[in-house]
Amino acid sequence: MPNYLIAHLDELPHVKCPCGFTRRAFADSKHTVASLHVVDIQEDARTHYHKQMTEIYLVLEGDGQMELDGKLVPVKPMTAIYIMPGCRHRAVGKLKIINIPVPAFDEQDEWFD
């Protein structure tokens, strides 16, 4: 097995998620410590949190807000957000983001109040 992985995100399927739709690279590999997602946030996302995962968001397109533990923070392209485990969060508005979960995304670590 090579010492690298390659993903063509434009060839990955869109998957429904609490934020809209996502394409997830490296989420199904046991060899990754992180995954990379391109997320199209269609509407206001559903508030959720993670007990284990840290997430790093990078806004690519759109102007909106992130709700972080109840506080609304304005975001625009090239805004980066570091979301630690336990932080209740959601995007507000139509955005396109890159999401890097660490460790790699696990749908069992997605919690809703």
Task: Show where each model-derived region lies.
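Ligand-binding loop in jelly-roll beta-barrel domains
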Residues: P85-E110
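A cytosolic small-molecule/anion-sensing beta-strand core signal
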Residues: H37, L60-E61, K76-P77, G93
